[in-house]
Amino acid sequence: MAEAPQVVETDPDFEPLPRQRSCTWPLPRPEFNQSNSTTSSPAPSGGAAANPDAAASLASASAVSTDFMSNLSLLEESEDFARAPGCVAVAAAAAASRGLCGDFQGPEAGCVHPAPPQPPPTGPLSQPPPVPPSAAAAAGPLAGQPRKTSSSRRNAWGNLSYADLITKAIESSAEKRLTLSQIYEWMVKSVPYFKDKGDSNSSAGWKNSIRHNLSLHSKFIRVQNEGTGKSSWWMLNPEGGKSGKSPRRRAASMDNNSKFAKSRGRAAKKKASLQSGQEGPGDSPGSQFSKWPASPGSHSNDDFDNWSTFRPRTSSNASTISGRLSPIMTEQDDLGDGDVHSLVYPPSAAKMASTLPSLSEISNPENMENLLDNLNLLSSPTSLTVSTQSSPGSMMQQTPCYSFAPPNTSLNSPSPNYSKYTYGQSSMSPLPQMPMQTLQDSKSSYGGLNQYNCAPGLLKELLTSDSPPHNDIMSPVDPGVAQPNSRVLGQNVMMGPNSVMPAYGSQASHNKMMNPSSHTHPGHAQQTASVNGRTLPHVVNTMPHTSAMNRLTPVKTPLQVPLSHPMQMSALGSYSSVSSCNGYGRMGVLHQEKLPSDLDGMFIERLDCDMESIIRNDLMDGDTLDFNFDNVLPNQSFPHSVKTTTHSWVSG
C-alpha cells in the first residue's frame, strides 16, 4: 500500500487527467457511453471475453485506476486511501462484466464510471460526509441537552421563579430584610441574566414582575421603615404563608349558596309552626288574633326586618309587638302636621306596587287637630268586658265580642250590647280572571268623611275607662304595615252607638250593625260601584242616631279606600257603598245634603291601582284567604242611619 503514492509520482502523464470529463463529478453517463462507442471495437470486446489474459488486463486496469484515484485523493488520509484499491477493484470487475476491453486505455474511463458511486467514502469531496456522522455523534448530546434543558427550565435565567429569587435575595442579606431597590440590585449582581438589564429601559419589565410577586405572595410581608422618606422593608413571613395564587372564590348563587337553603328551611319550619298554632283552640282574643296573617302574634322579630324593607317609613309604636296600640296620643309633641295621615291598612295593601299619595297631602291639618282634641277628652271610667262567642254568621269564625256598658245607663233602658258587633275573618273565594272595567273616568276620585256623628259623652267614657288598654279591643294591626301615627285614626275604636266604627282590618266583616233599641230617623244614602260588572258589598256600620247626640266638628279628610277587599254582610241589612275608580271609591258619611264645596272638585292625580293585579298577585298569596263574590244583598233602608265603611288605609 505504501507503493501506491510512488506510482503516482512516477507517472505524471497519466492520460485521463487532462480530460475534461475526469474533472467533472459525477461523470456524465452519455459522455462515457459515447467515448466507449468511439474508442472501443467489437472485436476486442469479444476477444476479451474469450481470451484467458482478461484477468491480467483487469489487474493492470485496476492498477491504473488506483493511480488515478490516488491523484484525486491527494488530500485524503492514509487510512481512507487504503480502502480505495478494493473499491476500484470492484469497479474494474463491474467494467469487465460489461465486456469492456482491458488493453485499451478507454476502458479506464469506463472504470472510472462505476467508481463515482464509490468515491463518496474516498474522494476529497466525500470527506465531509464521514465527518457529519462523527460530528453528529459528538454533538448529539450537546444538541439534545439544550432542548432538554429548555423544556425543564421555567425561565430564561433558570428554574427559579421570581418568588424564589426574591427569597434568596432576602435570605442573603444580614438583617433578613431588603428594600425594593436593594432587591433590584441583588438581581443585577447575582443573576447573570439580569446583569445587562439593569438600565431603566430594559429593567421595566422584570422590575414590575418583582413588585407583582412581592404583593402577590403571602410569604413576603411589608414592614414600615422607621426612617422618614424611606421605602418599606420586605421580609419573609415567619408564619410561612403561601407562595402561590389563592383559589378563586366563586360568586354565591342560589345553587351553591348554603344560606339560601337554610333560609328556606327556616321558612318551612315557621309556616309549620304557624299552622299548628292555628289548629289549637284559642283561650283568649290574643290566641284568636294569632291565627290571622295580619296579627302581631303571627310575625316573629325576624319578619320585621323584611317588612321594613317594603315599608321603610314604618316607625310608629305599632311596628313592634310590645308597642302601645291605643288611640290616645301619649306623645303629641312629635306629631307633625304631615304625620297625621299615618293610618292602618291591611297587610295585603302592603305589597301594592303603585305609590299612593299620602293623606297629609289631601287633608286639612286643622280638621285633624280638632279630631285629636275630641279624642283626648277626659271622662269617668267605664266598664269594658271581653267575651268570646260564636258568631251566627255562616262565614264568621269564632271571634271575640265586646260588651260596652256606660255607667249612667238607666235600669229601664237596655244597655247597648256591643257583642253584636262581631269581627271575624270573612270567607272569600277566588275571583275569576276578568279584565278591569271602570264606570267612571280613569282618575281616582275620593269622597270625604263628611260628618262624625257621635255623642261626646260616650266618646269620653270610652277613652277614659279604667279597663285594660285599648289594644285589647283593637284590630290585629300588622305592625309591619302600620304607619307612624296609626294610633290617631287607624285604630278600631268602638265608640258610642252613633260613633264611627272603623273597620277591624281588611278581612273583617261587621255582622250585626243595628241596635234594636235605638231610635232611628228616616233617610239613608247609597253608593254603588261595579268592578267587572259585579257589585262588591262594602262592610257598613249602621249606627243609631239619637236626638240627644251632638255632632262633632266635620272632618273634611278624603280617605283612600281600595276596594280590593270585598266584605260581606251577614246581618240585618247591608248598607252597600261601592264605587269604581280604579278600585277606589268615595268614603265617608253621606247625607242628602250636598258635599262641601271644597271637596267637590277634589281629585287625586297620578294614582294607578290595578285591582285585577292586586287580587291575583297580592291577595292570593295568603293561604287563609278565600274569596267569595256572592250576589249583593238587597239594599235595606234604615232611616237616617249613619254610614261608615271599612277603612283600608293606604300609606303615603
From Swiss-Prot:
Impact noted for substituting residue 313 to K: Little change in levels of methylation
GO biological process, one term: canonical Wnt signaling pathway
SUPFAM superfamilies referenced in this protein's UniProt entry, alphabetically: Winged helix' DNA-binding domain
Effect of residue 463 to A: Decreased transcriptional activity by about 2-fold in the absence of serum. Nuclear location but transcriptional activity decreased by about 50%. Abolishes the SIRT1 deacetylase binding and increases acetylation
Outcome reported for the amino acid change (mutating residue 219 to Q): Mimics acetylation. Cytoplasmic location in absence or presence of insulin, no change on the inhibitory effect of oxidative stress on insulin-induced phosphorylations, but no inhibition of these phosphorylations by resveratrol
Tree of life domain: Eukaryota
SMART domains per record: FH (SM00339)
Keyword Transcription: yes
Effect of residue 147 to K: Little change in levels of methylation
Main location: cytoplasm
Protein name: Forkhead box protein O1
Lineage of source species: Eukaryota, Metazoa, Chordata, Craniata, Vertebrata
